Amino acid sequence: MLPQLFLDRMKQMLEEEYPAFLNSYEDTRYQALRINPSKTDTDRFIEETSFHLQPVPWEANGFYYEKEDQPGKHPYHEAGVYYIQEPSAMAPAAYLDAQPGEKVLDLCAAPGGKSTQIAAAMQGKGLLVSNEIHPARAKILSENMERMGVKNVMVTNESPQTLAGMFTEYFDRIMVDAPCSGEGMFRKNEQACEEWSPENVQVCAARQQEILACAASMLRPGGRMVYSTCTFAPEENEGTISRFLEQHPQFHIVPVKKYPGMADGVAAWTKHPAAEIGDTIRLFPHHLHGEGHFVAVLEKEGTVSENYRGYCANGEEKPLAKGEAKAYLAGLQEFLGKIPADDAGRLFLFGEQLYLMPEHMPATRRLHVLRPGLHLGTVKKNRLEPAHALALAISPQEACHSWNLSVDEARAYLAGQTFPAEGEKGWYLITVDGYSLGWGKLAGSVMKNHYPKGLRKLL
């Protein structure tokens, strides 16, 4: 049941469009997935898949699928071949337009849809800091970054205020997918509907101002920031952006291409609208195939030199010294083929866990870090056991040994089953149709299952 006060406000906002908006709640909800370009070629996947896919206009790797496809129950999902994501939610990261080699912050990143989309655009180059303030959600974020094979991410569990105290004009781009009243998700999420109130809208709007102010201080001059919500409330959209611009005159709204069905922000819906508020973007379910969303693309005025680094209070993390790294490199070669020289210079020990640091990764002290780069393995006595994250980040060609499974065999592997195998003993990268899934270890004539017990499931 939609809240009556919400309906009354939407009727006032939409006027003659209101009946069409209301009818959209009776329509089937559109579902989509985003293909992971680090795992597969998009054209190849479309050609080979049995899924019924249609393109999402604003995201090159995004596709609507049909309910009977059930991509979440396919082993390809566990292999990180795609990420299931609400179609409208793909728009903000597309407009962020992150580039390889940049330093990018996703400030409110859980569960990870936008972060994994940003990571795909960065192609494993540069530094992505994906942050989430709530510990349980930060854990889910970290797991999703792992599943999608992201190599250059630092996952943190901090408040925006703590990060703002660490980083000054440091990031090239910042995504602020702000906590909101969730009105755009009422069709998808009954809990958001039950928790809604006009008072909560005001609370969210105030919190959004605080988050944006923190983000503003961390963005370098000339940098881009995208603000997004999944709500219709003007107080959290046009209102929040107008107030932010009034308090931060060094920012302006960037006019961007709007795709068919996207609407302009509306000045009349807020008391003191910014002059260019019409250049923000509204996504309504009665206009396009997706849920409710709002997007504002902002730019900070000024320019910086090519070698500009910004300020990080922690400084950069120091990698292992060459002599110390040498022993771990030997351990890695038990299950990896050739290790690039550049990677060999970025090894980092986090407790007993060996990681490959992203370029220019900030030092981890005074930060609650869940994932400082790509997890390579666990140090156990005098040996190195490969990490699940490593399996998901490499191709079969990069492993010393690999073992390919059919889809049905992969389902058994994901459930924790062992299987008979013959070959050279040792670690094997287990794949499904050539997509990496996890590790197995061949001993005797049995491939022991090393898929993490906490992730095992029946598909």
Residue ranges of model-derived segments:
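Polybasic, low-complexity RNA-engagement segments
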Residues: 1-13, 17-48, 291-294, 301-459
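Conserved AdoMet
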Residues: 34-90
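Conserved class I S-adenosyl-L-methionine
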Residues: 101-110
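Conserved SAM-binding loop of SAM-dependent methyltransferases across substrates and taxa
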Residues: 111-124
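Helix-to-beta-strand junctions that scaffold the AdoMet/dcAdoMet cofactor pocket
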Residues: 123, 219-221
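S-adenosyl-L-methionine
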Residues: 131-169
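Mobile active-site "lid"/loop adjacent to the S-adenosyl-L-methionine
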Residues: 136, 172-213, 230-237, 260, ...
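Class I S-adenosyl-L-methionine
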Residues: 171, 224-227, 232-355
